[in-house]
Amino acid sequence: MKKYPLNVLAMALFYVAAGLNHFINPAFYLPLIPRYFPYQTLINWSSGVIEVVLGLLLIPTFSRKWAAFGIMAMLIAFIPSHVYFIEVNSCAGDLCVPEWIGWFRLVMIHPLLVYWAWSNRNA
């Protein structure tokens, strides 16, 4: 049996679970999609599919590099959603958090997720 780096498997599981959650709990994600984007439901479903596919593509070594780059591109594409979350007072539907959490997600968590993908591209 081939051994996979635990970090890569954790990342794959993270993105597959996050992607599936777009279908299980769309009410969580829909308020995070900026209102100025049309087709919020399509965006939510597409994001879920992309996250699941990229998460699965992290597992085989032959596709890991491209999956990592895809995740980085996806995370960059999600930046407007993070900015929008701050613009709407860090509220997504009925869930409201202190504004600093919205900024922390944008300035710290988001770059760390990009770095995580970058660090796993050749793992």
Residue ranges and their predicted role:
Residues 1-123:
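Membrane-interface extramembranous regions
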